[in-house]
Amino acid sequence: MNNVILQELKNIVSTERVTCNEPLSKHTSFKIGGPADYFVITKKIEETAAVIQCCNQHNLPLLMIGKGSNLLISDAGIRGVVLKQEDNTEGFFVTQCEEGYLVTGGAGMNLSAFAMKIANESLTGFEFAAGIPGSLGGAVYMNAGAYGGEIKDCIKSARVLTKEGQILSLNREELELSYRSSIIQKKGYYVIDATFLLQKGNQEDILRKIEELNQARKDKQPLEYPSAGSTFKRPEGYFAGKLIMDAGLRGYRVGGAMVSEKHCGFVINTGDATAKDVLQLIDDVRRIVKEKFGVTLEPEVRLIGEKVNP
């Protein structure tokens, strides 16, 4: 561990928000992941920008995470700095405009909490996101979606930090949002906050829809187990979960990793899974589905760290 780098990071944020060899299993929804060389929590844009600058000066790799809900991190961990933005980053704002209402939230906000704040303002158009795990920044990064809605349907703009620490404001077109993809991924930007264009609605109807979607998730998804959400992207013309089920892989296990019996599109951690287990299972599922149906499944989960390529 480099004491000079450690001290620089502690000078940027308070000492208690910098740790060394932090187990990333504590910060991912999969409950899997080895240690980060340096783990830093930021609360302000200025802190995040300063950490980026520090990493650039020392040629350190930087990974920014939100709630860690779409990540599989190597058992060997992450070299360099892992930066996590806290929930309250940059707050929550609502302003009226000619087109409707603009709602802005910080990247570190819990996505479901952000959706409920919107519902409490009697604004409609964001109900689909209420049960999606993760942070707002992660949702924008991945163009998250569920039950017929996705981020690109309602986003107006997002502010990002470049790898050089420059702040950019990108409109909907500039974000280049498509299925689980964005310019943010392609350029390696870091989300600061995002603004959405929404409309007034009936609060009772909005809350009822959220409740219905959350119940559907509970009924259909293995929420009782750690996972990274949907493991595979939806192949054109197919559903990944059905292909996996039809291939006879329901309940298929490698070590502590298992294809969920409740929803075959999810790989779950039954208690002691390693990244190696999950990666082997992903390999097996992709191979068998390809052999049986000629369809190549692509991971939706971000595979990060040493020796994590499927």
Curated annotation (Swiss-Prot):
Keywords: Cell cycle, Cell division, Cell shape, Cell wall biogenesis/degradation, Cytoplasm, FAD, Flavoprotein, NADP, Oxidoreductase, Peptidoglycan synthesis. It catalyses: UDP-N-acetyl-alpha-D-muramate + NADP(+) = UDP-N-acetyl-3-O-(1-carboxyvinyl)-alpha-D-glucosamine + NADPH + H(+). InterPro entries: FAD-bd_PCMH, FAD-bd_PCMH-like_sf, FAD-bd_PCMH_sub1, FAD-bd_PCMH_sub2, MurB, MurB_C, MurB_C_sf, Oxid_FAD_bind_N. Its EC number is 1.3.1.98. One of its GO terms (biological process) is cell wall organization. SUPFAM superfamilies: FAD-binding/transporter-associated domain-like, Uridine diphospho-N-Acetylenolpyruvylglucosamine reductase, MurB, C-terminal domain. Its main location: cytoplasm. GO terms for molecular function: FAD binding; UDP-N-acetylmuramate dehydrogenase activity. It comes from the Bacteria. Pfam families: FAD_binding_4, MurB_C. GO terms for cellular component: cytosol. Pathway: Cell wall biogenesis; peptidoglycan biosynthesis. Residues 31-216 form the FAD-binding PCMH-type domain. It is found in: Cytoplasm. Its cofactor is FAD. The active site is at R180, S230 (proton donor), E300. Belongs to the MurB family. PANTHER family: UDP-N-ACETYLENOLPYRUVOYLGLUCOSAMINE REDUCTASE. Cell wall formation. This is UDP-N-acetylenolpyruvoylglucosamine reductase. The lineage of its organism: Bacteria, Bacillati, Bacillota, Clostridia, Lachnospirales.
